[in-house]
A protein has these predicted regions:
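N-terminal alpha-helical modules
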Residues: 2-141
Protein backbone atom coordinates (compact mmCIF):
# COMPACT_ATOMS: atom_id res chain seq x y z
CA UNK A 1 0.00 0.00 0.00
CA UNK A 2 1.10 3.54 -0.56
CA UNK A 3 0.05 6.29 1.77
CA UNK A 4 -0.26 10.05 1.81
CA UNK A 5 0.68 11.60 5.13
CA UNK A 6 -0.34 15.06 6.23
CA UNK A 7 -0.89 16.90 9.48
CA UNK A 8 -4.36 16.55 10.94
CA UNK A 9 -6.24 19.34 12.71
CA UNK A 10 -4.56 18.61 16.04
CA UNK A 11 -1.10 18.55 14.45
CA UNK A 12 -0.91 14.75 14.48
CA UNK A 13 0.24 12.94 11.38
CA UNK A 14 -2.66 11.43 9.47
CA UNK A 15 -1.99 8.74 6.90
CA UNK A 16 -4.52 8.07 4.17
CA UNK A 17 -4.50 5.06 1.88
CA UNK A 18 -3.87 6.33 -1.61
CA UNK A 19 -3.93 3.15 -3.64
CA UNK A 20 -3.00 -0.47 -3.41
CA UNK A 21 0.23 -1.35 -5.13
CA UNK A 22 0.65 -4.96 -4.05
CA UNK A 23 -1.75 -7.73 -4.89
CA UNK A 24 -0.69 -9.98 -2.03
CA UNK A 25 -2.65 -7.95 0.53
CA UNK A 26 -6.10 -9.45 1.01
CA UNK A 27 -9.04 -7.13 0.63
CA UNK A 28 -10.10 -8.06 4.16
CA UNK A 29 -6.80 -6.98 5.71
CA UNK A 30 -6.76 -3.86 3.55
CA UNK A 31 -10.23 -2.88 4.76
CA UNK A 32 -9.27 -3.63 8.35
CA UNK A 33 -6.43 -1.11 8.12
CA UNK A 34 -8.79 1.48 6.67
CA UNK A 35 -11.30 0.78 9.46
CA UNK A 36 -8.58 1.32 12.06
CA UNK A 37 -7.63 4.67 10.55
CA UNK A 38 -11.29 5.66 10.27
CA UNK A 39 -11.94 4.69 13.90
CA UNK A 40 -9.05 6.85 15.09
CA UNK A 41 -10.36 9.78 13.06
CA UNK A 42 -13.90 9.20 14.33
CA UNK A 43 -12.60 9.12 17.90
CA UNK A 44 -10.94 12.50 17.37
CA UNK A 45 -14.17 13.86 15.91
CA UNK A 46 -16.12 12.64 18.94
CA UNK A 47 -13.59 13.83 21.53
CA UNK A 48 -15.14 17.26 22.00
CA UNK A 49 -11.64 18.73 21.90
CA UNK A 50 -11.69 20.09 18.34
CA UNK A 51 -12.95 23.44 17.15
CA UNK A 52 -15.65 23.36 14.47
CA UNK A 53 -13.23 24.14 11.64
CA UNK A 54 -10.93 21.32 12.80
CA UNK A 55 -13.90 18.96 12.88
CA UNK A 56 -14.90 20.03 9.37
CA UNK A 57 -11.37 19.40 8.12
CA UNK A 58 -11.06 16.03 9.83
CA UNK A 59 -14.49 14.92 8.60
CA UNK A 60 -13.39 15.77 5.06
CA UNK A 61 -10.24 13.69 5.57
CA UNK A 62 -12.39 10.80 6.79
CA UNK A 63 -14.49 11.01 3.64
CA UNK A 64 -11.32 11.17 1.53
CA UNK A 65 -10.00 8.06 3.26
CA UNK A 66 -13.05 6.07 2.11
CA UNK A 67 -13.23 7.76 -1.28
CA UNK A 68 -9.58 6.94 -1.99
CA UNK A 69 -10.23 3.32 -1.07
CA UNK A 70 -13.29 3.28 -3.29
CA UNK A 71 -11.21 4.57 -6.20
CA UNK A 72 -8.51 2.01 -5.49
CA UNK A 73 -11.02 -0.83 -5.57
CA UNK A 74 -12.62 0.58 -8.72
CA UNK A 75 -9.25 0.57 -10.50
CA UNK A 76 -8.72 -3.07 -9.60
CA UNK A 77 -12.22 -3.99 -10.73
CA UNK A 78 -11.53 -2.46 -14.15
CA UNK A 79 -8.53 -4.78 -14.43
CA UNK A 80 -10.26 -7.95 -13.25
CA UNK A 81 -13.93 -7.94 -14.28
CA UNK A 82 -15.19 -8.91 -17.70
CA UNK A 83 -16.45 -6.16 -20.00
CA UNK A 84 -20.19 -6.87 -19.54
CA UNK A 85 -19.96 -6.91 -15.76
CA UNK A 86 -17.91 -3.72 -15.79
CA UNK A 87 -20.42 -1.99 -18.08
CA UNK A 88 -23.25 -2.88 -15.72
CA UNK A 89 -21.22 -1.86 -12.69
CA UNK A 90 -20.27 1.45 -14.30
CA UNK A 91 -23.94 2.35 -14.73
CA UNK A 92 -24.63 1.32 -11.14
CA UNK A 93 -21.74 3.53 -10.04
CA UNK A 94 -23.11 6.52 -11.94
CA UNK A 95 -26.49 6.00 -10.27
CA UNK A 96 -24.82 5.59 -6.88
CA UNK A 97 -22.92 8.87 -7.33
CA UNK A 98 -26.18 10.74 -8.06
CA UNK A 99 -27.84 9.18 -5.02
CA UNK A 100 -24.82 9.97 -2.85
CA UNK A 101 -24.67 13.58 -4.00
CA UNK A 102 -28.38 14.06 -3.22
CA UNK A 103 -28.05 12.44 0.21
CA UNK A 104 -25.01 14.58 1.05
CA UNK A 105 -26.83 17.75 0.04
CA UNK A 106 -29.85 16.71 2.09
CA UNK A 107 -27.67 15.98 5.13
CA UNK A 108 -26.37 19.55 5.18
CA UNK A 109 -29.69 21.32 4.63
CA UNK A 110 -30.54 21.81 8.31
CA UNK A 111 -27.30 23.74 8.79
CA UNK A 112 -27.19 25.39 5.36
CA UNK A 113 -24.74 28.25 5.35
CA UNK A 114 -23.61 27.50 8.88
CA UNK A 115 -20.30 26.22 10.15
CA UNK A 116 -21.83 22.80 10.88
CA UNK A 117 -22.90 22.18 7.26
CA UNK A 118 -19.54 20.78 6.05
CA UNK A 119 -19.35 18.36 8.98
CA UNK A 120 -22.83 17.00 8.31
CA UNK A 121 -22.18 16.66 4.60
CA UNK A 122 -18.75 15.07 5.05
CA UNK A 123 -20.09 12.60 7.61
CA UNK A 124 -22.83 11.49 5.21
CA UNK A 125 -20.36 11.26 2.31
CA UNK A 126 -17.96 9.16 4.41
CA UNK A 127 -20.77 6.84 5.52
CA UNK A 128 -21.99 6.30 1.97
CA UNK A 129 -18.49 5.87 0.54
CA UNK A 130 -17.67 3.32 3.25
CA UNK A 131 -20.80 1.34 2.41
CA UNK A 132 -19.97 1.45 -1.30
CA UNK A 133 -16.41 0.28 -0.61
CA UNK A 134 -17.78 -2.86 1.03
CA UNK A 135 -20.25 -3.43 -1.82
CA UNK A 136 -17.52 -3.19 -4.45
CA UNK A 137 -15.01 -5.18 -2.38
CA UNK A 138 -17.30 -8.19 -2.73
CA UNK A 139 -16.29 -8.38 -6.39
CA UNK A 140 -12.65 -8.81 -5.33
CA UNK A 141 -13.24 -11.76 -3.03
Amino acid sequence: LTFDTFLGPSGDKVTVNDKTTTSDVSIESELQKIEEKAAAMQEDLSSGELAQQEMNTLSLQLYQLWDNELNSIWSRLKETLDEDTMTTLTQEERDWIKTKDSAVEEAGKDAEGGSLQPLLENDKAAELARNRVYELAEYLK
